[in-house]
């Protein structure tokens, strides 16, 4: 366990985020392809949500995380109507930088895998820096 700013996170922490693929989640609607299948950007978003939610309840009020890196392979297509889920596992930490192993599945198979990095932020300071 590593403690940063009174934040205690354990390597191996996992979270599962799931949804059912709708037409709005397809490559055709999203604009990332012509097929009516689960879009790669939507899969990556599901993976990011799993990683964000894995640590969300462990952060003090006023802190959250932002995505800083994705290295993902989308290895299989998924049809509209199928249930999909992403699992994020915290595998490394370097102060405020968090590294997650991420995988996505549908009802039949693994559909994606890779690495996702997030950074812990003080929300107020972060938003003030954008003005």
Ranges and model annotations:
Residues 4-39:
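Catalytic strand-loop segment that frames the active site of acyl-thioester-processing enzymes
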Residues 22-23, 31, 117-131:
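Surface-exposed, gly/pro-biased binding rims or lids
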Residues 24, 52, 91-95, 105-109, ...:
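Short coil/turn motifs at secondary-structure junctions
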Residues 34-42, 79, 99, 121:
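Residues at secondary-structure transition points
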Residues 53-85:
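Hydrophobic beta-strand-centered segment that forms part of the acyl-chain substrate-binding groove
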Residues 72-107:
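Hydrophobic beta-sheet segments that form the core/acyl-binding groove
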């Amino acid at each position: 366990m590593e403690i940063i700013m009174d934040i205690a996170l354990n390597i191996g922490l996992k979270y599962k985020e799931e949804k059912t693929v709708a037409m709005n989640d397809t490559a055709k609607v999203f604009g990332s392809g012509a097929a009516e299948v689960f879009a790669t950007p939507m899969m990556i978003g599901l993976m990011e949500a799993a990683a964000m939610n894995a640590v969300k309840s462990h952060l003090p009020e006023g802190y959250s995380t932002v995505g800083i890196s994705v290295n993902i392979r989308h290895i299989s297509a998924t049809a509209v109507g199928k249930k999909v889920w992403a699992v994020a596992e915290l595998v490394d930490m370097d102060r405020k930088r968090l590294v997650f192993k991420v995988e996505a599945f549908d009802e039949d198979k693994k559909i994606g895998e890779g690495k996702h990095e997030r950074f812990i932020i003080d929300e107020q300071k972060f938003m003030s820096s954008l003005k």
